[in-house]
Amino acid sequence: MPHSLVLNLLPQSPIPPQYLTGRHLHALFLTLVSSVDKELGDRLHDSTADKAFTLSPLQTNSSLLKGGREGSKLQYSHQQPIPGGTPCWWRISLLDDTLFGKLTQLWLNLNPNRPWHLGPADLYITSIQGTPQSIQPWANAKTYAQLYEEASDAYGGKLRNSSINLIFSTPTAFRQGQYDTTLPTRESVFNSLLSRWNKYSGIEFTQIAIESIFPSFVNIHTEILADSRSKFIGILGEVTYKILGTVEPIQIKQINALADFALYTGVGRKTTMGMGMARRLQGTGDRE
């Protein structure tokens, strides 16, 4: 069962920008895991380990308010410190019950007086959201069976049946052979979703009708994230994909289930470092 959890955090002192990178947030997550299961934390630290989780960059509460529809714009890099006392949030998604079960002790025994460390700053976890919120669209939880059963399987009267509007909220890139590509083609996006769905859901889709998916609206641009160790180029923005032609209802259902799954799994590379955060926007209608 995938969970999209939002941790609300309060730093006690400024967090310098060099400690707000995906690498440092990844380390903080492993520290959280190790606090309840050191063996699991060590295993996840192994670069070859199955990493059934994704992480967001650290957000200030204003991140959901400054532009973008439905909280679609997120802050993915920081040039200035986050001041002490600034309410922040951090999205952690867990893609299987094993990992969620291990971390249940952490959620249930949450000590608001225990500090966690991000660089020189102490952070307190003040609350955790795990269900949909009107002002926090990144929190949710559904079983894989629910995602599949609730996915539309027909064109019908609802516009969303044949139109999938995905927002890419942090820089997104895909592996193509030995290199990265930033173009969100139907193959790159839906094969990324399909691979993770088949890995974790227990409801295998042997083949989806990728040839019936067509981009109909594209509003994207590239961003470059560079630090002392690496450079990452990815796209941000919005793409609407339409399901066109003669398509079996079960294939429509599978494509819609994958699109809804994007909230939890993200797409493309470095999703455990804050990249590739994507989400389906509802109620946007068809774009011509």
Where are the regions a protein language model picked out?
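RNA-interacting cores
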Residues: 1-288
